[in-house]
């Protein structure tokens, strides 16, 4: 449960059924892909046990010219759950912390309420395209 697989779930050159309709103007890219992936968030202090790790799953649209990424949209979170079955997670969010023509790094955060409130954080890097 530690690593969430990254799956390309849509390619605008091949697939008909969009998963997340892009907000970007078509002129700025040749095609786009939607990826489904996730980030594992860990806590510190009283919440540092790996048994409390949280998985945040999300979709992200990435725009390409030729084989190079030229932009992206805000990730769309689809869920948060305990990697090992723990509960009490809320407020999942994922942002793109950096990206280049062939790589994208995400930062995930969520709250865990279990006797106290803890902030869980993690990062995930995916290769493009």
Residue ranges of each PLM-predicted region?
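N-terminal prepro-regions of secreted/extracellular proteins
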Residues: 1-48
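Short, ordered beta-strand-loop transition motifs
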Residues: 13, 25-26, 97-105
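Residues that cap or initiate secondary-structure elements
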Residues: 13-14, 66-68, 112-114
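Generic short beta-strand segments
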Residues: 36-44, 76-79, 107-113
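Mature extracytoplasmic domains of secretory-pathway proteins
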Residues: 46-103
């Amino acid at each position: 449960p530690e690593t969430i697989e990254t799956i390309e779930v849509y390619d605008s050159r091949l697939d008909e059924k969009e998963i997340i309709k892009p907000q970007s103007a078509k002129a700025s890219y040749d095609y786009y892909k939607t990826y489904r992936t996730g980030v594992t968030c860990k806590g510190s202090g009283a919440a540092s046990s790996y048994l409390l790790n949280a998985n945040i799953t999300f979709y992200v649209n990435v725009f390409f010219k030729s084989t190079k990424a030229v932009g992206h949209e805000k990730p769309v979170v689809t869920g948060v759950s305990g990697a090992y079955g723990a509960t009490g997670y809320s407020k999942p969010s994922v942002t793109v912390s950096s990206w280049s023509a062939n790589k994208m790094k995400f930062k995930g955060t969520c709250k865990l309420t279990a006797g106290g409130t803890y902030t869980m954080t993690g990062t995930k890097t995916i290769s493009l395209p």
